[in-house]
Amino acid sequence: MLTHTLGFPRMGAHRELKKNLESYWKGAIGQEKLMASGRELRLRHWRLQQQAGIDLVPVGDFSYYDHMLDMVAMLGAVPPRFGWQGESVDLDTYFYMARGSSGHRTTTAMEMTKWFDTNYHYIVPEFYPGQRFRLARNRLFEELAEACIEGIQAKPVLPGPMTFIALGKEMVAGFDRWSHLDAVVEVYEEIVSRVAAKCSWIQLDEPILATDVPGPIRLRVRDVYRRLAAVAGPCRLMVATYFGALQENLDLALSLPVDGLHVDLVRAPGQLEKVLPCLPENMVLSLGLIDGRNVWRSNLRQAISTAQDAVVARGSDRVMIAPSCSLLHVPVDLAGEAVLDPRIRSWLAFARQKCQEVNVVRLALDGEDVTEVLQANDTAMENRRKSALVHRDAVRRRMADISPDMYCRRSSFEERKKQQAWLRLPTLPTTTIGSFPQVAGVRSARRSFKQGRISEEQYRAEMQRYIREAIAQQEALGLDVLVHGEPERNDMVEYFGEQLAGFCFTENGWVQGYGSRCVKPPIIYGDVERLKPMTMEWTTYAQQQTNRPLKGMLTGPVTMLCWSFVRDDQPRSATCKQIALAIRDEVQDLEQAGIKIIQVDEAALREGLPLRKSAWREYLGWAVDAFRLTASGVADSTQIHTHMCYSEFNHIAEWIAKMDADVISIEASRSNMELLGVLESFTYPNDIGPGVYDIHSPRVPSVAEMVELLRKASEVIPLERLWVNPDCGLKTRAWPETLASLRNMVAAAQKLRFFARG
C-alpha cells in the first residue's frame, strides 16, 4: 500500500520564499539567489515528507507565485498586453502577469480570485479568439530531474486540463473558452509524454469534478483523458478530486481511462460507499482521509476503520492513503509552536504531522503495532471533547436569548438615508476601505511591544503618531470619509481574534494567501465571547483629530469564520453566530462613543459559498443573518458600511441586498467592472462603491482610467447612490503609490461631479 500527498506548503516554515520573492522584486537579490532558495525549499520539503513516511512525493506543487499561473506559463497562454514574443516564458514575464509591473513596464495584472472555497488565491487564465498554445516553460521537467537526482520517488502534479479551462475566463464577449480545449490538451499530451519516462505516477488535479459541471463539458472529459492515457505509456495517471463529493460526476470519474482516482473523504465521507461497488477492477483508489484544509488532529481509529473497509473491498495493492487535498492550506510544522497552550497544541496537526498521520493509517493496515500512537490520539480526542477551554456557559445562554428583532434595522433604507443626511456628504463621496500602508516603523513598534521591548506608553505614542499622519494625509487628499489607517492591526482577523475568547494564535502558523502574501489564520477552538472593547481607543482618538466623518472599522463574523481554522465539533453556523454577538457589542460601543459610520467588512462572504449551488441557500441564510445580527442594533442615523472582495455576484445579488447595509464597497476594477453586468439585471437598492483601482498591483492608475470606470458605473448606478473607493485596503502598498493613486481617485470623482453638474 502506497502513501502520497497531493501537495505541500511552498513558503517554508519561516516564510523563507516570501522574503526572497520580495527581495527579488525590490532588486535586492538576483534571479540566481531566488532560484537557489527555491531549490533549497523544495529539497527540504521533499525530505520532510519522505521522512514522515510518504512514498510518492509531489513535484510541481511548488510555485514562485501560483500553480495556475505556472500552467499559464507552461502552455504559453500569456495575454497579449504583456508583450510576450513567443519564446520561453521567463521569470520576469511570469511575475509581470501576476503583478502588472516589471521594471519600467506597467499594465493591468491578470485577475486573481479564490481557489474554490479556500483562502488561497489563484491567477485566472485568460482566453482569446485565435490564441495559440505551446510548451513554453520547462520548470516541471527541471524540478522532476532535481527530485530524481536526490533519490525522491516523485509524482508530478498538474492542474488538470478541465479544471484549468473551467477556472479561466473569456476576454472577448461571445467567445467560448472551451473551443481551445483540443489545443490545450495537445500541450498536455507533450507534457505527460515527457515526464512519463521518469516517474511511475502523474497526478492531474480535477477538483472541478466536485462542482456542478455543465453537461456539454462533462461529455468531453473522457476523450481528454483517453488522449492523455495514450501518451503516458507505462506511467500511471491519477485524477485527483477534492473539496467535495463527486455526486453526479461519480460515474464519469469512474469511467475515465486512468489508473487511479483520489476522493475527498473528509468533506464527503459518505461517498466511499458509493465509490467502492462501482470502482473498475484495474483502478487504484486514493483515500483522502486526513484533513488537508484544517489543523485538527485526525481521529485515527476512524480513519483506519474507513481505510480497512476499502482494503477489504479492493485489496491493499489497489488502495492508497493520502490527505484529502493539498497541504498547501495548512502551516508546515507544529514543532515550531513553543508558546501555544499545550492543551490546545495536543489537539492540532500541521502539514508534517498530517504526513505522519497518513503513515500511521498505512502502518496499521499493514499490520504494524501502532497501539501507543492510537492511545495518544484517543486521549487528545477525549480531552478536547470535555475541555472547559472549549465550552462557555455564558455564550450558550446568550445564544438561546437571540430574538427575531435583533436581526433587523429599525427603518427602511430610504428612511435611514434621510436620517443620515446630517453627514453632509457630497455626490460621489470618496473614501478608502480601511487600512493604510504599514511602514517598517509601525510593524517594528507592534513587534517590540508584543515582545516587551517598549512600554505601553511608547507603543501608544507611535500608533497615535501614525493615526495623526494618516488623518492629515486624507484631509490633504480631500477624501470625504476618513479612516484611522489600522496601524495597530497586523491582520484584520487576527487583531480581533486576539481579543476574543475562543480564539488562539500560532507563532509560525503561516499559510500562503497569494504570491508572497502569507497569513497566519487564528484557530477557533471554543465558544467565542468579547471580553472587552477592541477598537474604541484608536477609533475615538482618530475622530478627535478631524471634523470629517470617520469610519469605525470592524471585521464581520463570516469573514472571521472563513479566514480562520474553525472548530469542527459544532456547525459553522453556530460558531458564526457566536462571533456575530461579539462584534455586535463592539458596534454598539462605537456608536455610543460618537462614531456614526461603522464598517463591518464581509470580504469573505462570497468565498464561503459551498461549491454546489444546491447548498447555497442554507449557507447564505445563516451568513446574512450573522451580518444582520452584528449590524442591526444601531440607530437609523448611524450609517453601516460593508466591504466585499471579488465581483462574481450574479447569483447572490439578492442575498447581498438582504444584508441591508447602507453602503457596500466591492472589489471591481481588476475585473474591469464585471460587477456592473450584474447590476444591469438586478437593481441594488442601497448605496454602492465599486472599486475603481486594483490595490494588489503597485501600478498607479491614471485619472482618465478611473473616470472611465466611474462613468461606466454611473450608467447602471444612480449618482446619488454611487461611492468612490479603491478595491480593497491599502496595507500592503507603499505610501508614494498610495498617495498618488488616491490623489487621482479624488480627482476622478471631482471630474465626474463636474460633468454631472453639466
Curated annotation (Swiss-Prot):
Pfam families, per database record: Meth_synt_1, Meth_synt_2
Cofactor note: Binds 1 zinc ion per subunit.
Binding site for L-methionine: I433, G434, S435, E486, D601
This protein's record includes keyword DNA-binding: no
One Gene Ontology biological process: methylation
List of catalytic residues: H696
Pathway: Amino-acid biosynthesis; L-methionine biosynthesis via de novo pathway; L-methionine from L-homocysteine (MetE route): step 1/1
PANTHER family: 5-METHYLTETRAHYDROPTEROYLTRIGLUTAMATE--HOMOCYSTEINE METHYLTRANSFERASE
Family note: Belongs to the vitamin-B12 independent methionine synthase family.
Function: Catalyzes the transfer of a methyl group from 5-methyltetrahydrofolate to homocysteine resulting in methionine formation.
Protein name: 5-methyltetrahydropteroyltriglutamate--homocysteine methyltransferase
Native source species: Syntrophotalea carbinolica (strain DSM 2380 / NBRC 103641 / GraBd1)
